[in-house]
Structure formats: C-alpha cells, structure tokens
Amino acid sequence: HNIDTSKIDLPITWNDEIFVPFDWGHFAFIYNSEKLKSPPTSFEELSDDKNSLSLIIQDPRTSTPGLGLLLWVKSIFKENSDEIWERLSPKIVTVTKGWSEAYGLFLEGEADLVLSYTTSPAYHIMAEEEKKYKAAIFNEGHYLQVEVAAITLKGEKNKLSRDFMKFILSENFQSVIPTTNWMFPVTDIK
C-alpha cells in the first residue's frame, strides 16, 4: 500500500503491506443493567445451564463480530471449544446476518445479551444519555478486532485510492471514529 503507518498505535504490532487499520475494539456481550442485575463474568458463567440467559449472536460467515466470537471462543478453549458451543446453543435466540440486526433485536428486548463491542455503551451514554447498557467484562479477556481498508488491484493506479488511504489515518478522520463508529482510533488523537 506504500502508506506511512508509523503513527499507528494499536494494542498489537501491525506490519501489513496490504491492509491499513482505521479503528479497533474488543468484542463483548452487552446487557441492559436494569433487566440483568448479575451479568456473566466468563464464558463458563455465560454457558452454565443453571442460568436462563438468552443471547443474540451474528453469523461468522457474514459478520466480523460473528467470526470474532468464533475465534474468541477458540482462543480460550482450544480443542474444547465444541463443548462451550454445545452449552451456549440452547441460549442462542437467533443468529443474525449482521451486527445491526442483532443489536436492534436486543434493544427490542429479544434477548438478555448481544454480541457487540466493549465500546457500545459509549454510544448510549453520549448519543442518548442512557447508562443502562453495559459490557459484560469477562475474566478470560476480550478478543480484539481491527477494522481495515485496502486498495484493490483496480484502484492501485488511482491517485484518489491512495489519497483516501492516507486520509483514513489523518487527524480529521481518526478524531471522529470514537463518536461515529464507536470504536477506538488507530492513531493518537487530541
């Protein structure tokens, strides 16, 4: 891509010649604290058959949060991942194609928790002045997602493509990420 990425500041080392990151966040299950007083603090608690928790998740074939959940579970439970999925299965109300549909169903009260990001409550606080939505913090930690952009082969010779890639790392672009995409910027903004 030949884009200067020296100002990128991520929780991981980034060395990629094709993809340029533009934001990042950690996956989490979001809940309504007025309805769910004791949220799960681990996948073990989430999948425990002694609770009646209900979940909405996204399809890993069509949604990056869905794929992120698959990888998150695999990173923690490795060869025992199937056991967690078996325990989670009866709790899953639906598997949506994407994040928007899943989050909308959650807001309508269709489930106790929805797969989203640790930053999702910030939207409700800042845009709606609503503090009841929280991220369930898991003892195992949370899986990182870095959203990226790339120049296609067709756009490789297009100056506008390269200019846009530079723009996504600019202060003007990065400074609006926290309150428009509700994720963390990849550069240090003021």
Feature-to-residue mapping (PLM):
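Extracytoplasmic ligand-binding site segments that recognize negatively charged/polar headgroups
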Residues: 1-111
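Ligand-binding "clamshell"
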Residues: 8-17, 124-137
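Periplasmic-binding protein-like
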Residues: 25, 85-89, 95-96, 128-153, ...
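Solvent-exposed loop/turn segments at secondary-structure junctions
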Residues: 27, 34-37, 61-64, 119-122, ...
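A bilobed periplasmic-binding-protein/Venus flytrap-type ligand-binding module shared by bacterial periplasmic
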Residues: 28-35, 74, 145-157, 176-177
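Alpha-helix capping/helix-boundary segments
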Residues: 102, 120-121, 173
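A ligand-binding cleft/hinge motif common to bilobed small-molecule-binding domains
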Residues: 107, 111-132
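Mature extracytoplasmic/periplasmic domains
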Residues: 152-190
